[in-house]
Amino acid sequence: MTTDIDSTALITGASRGLGLALARSLAQRGWALILDARGAPALQDARADLANLTTVIAIPGDVTDAGHRRSLATAAGELGGLEAVVNNASILGPSPQPQLLDYPLDVLEGVYRTNVIAPLAVLQALRYALKPGARIVNVTSDAAVEPYPGWGGYGSSKAALQQLSAILAAENPDLRVYSVDPGDMRTQLHQQAFPGEDICDRPLPEESVPGLVELLEGNLSSGHYEARALVHAQGGR
């Protein structure tokens, strides 16, 4: 059953994992959605599923592509602007992950383009579609702050995104800008990080979603949060 929320969110990386789980939750709560992902078939499957609940525009493409970002901005204008942007799309890099002294620099540049530059580029493309008080959620990782051996490429990119979020918040007090660590999850990206390992003991992405919903619908100040800690602190939503 949907609620009466009259808001629109754009979610990148929304064809599976955390992005899809969040999209489903917001659709059930009455949010209109603009969804992005690189894989067109999976994204269209998601759109077909969620269109039974709410208005959904699905735009396949790569957030590192300027033309794709313009398409996202056009869709945001068609829906009357945005109350929220969730920068969830990211890439791990090589699997298994190399140590930094062995990391191919051209590959590392690609990780930074997707995980750091693209989220900012998306926001620049959408700046005139953001409504006053809009929420920006940049999905980071505990690898941004913990020096896990072998996680230098991905972790440092998420550290850069976390600091970018903090500065963006300081520069735009009219917006609420969050970086959020969703915690370990049973996702394809996490499986890529641990090739050959059974990750069935990791929580499903759905367990982190209530924390993200709290950021999107609550009254928390800009800052960095841990999604599952928010769930416990707020008693769920």
Language-model-derived ranges and their functions:
Residues 70, 90-109, 150:
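Conserved mid-core segment of classical short-chain dehydrogenase/reductases
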Residues 123, 157-160:
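Active-site helix of classical SDR
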Residues 129-130, 146, 167-176:
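Active-site-adjacent segment of SDR/Rossmann-fold oxidoreductases
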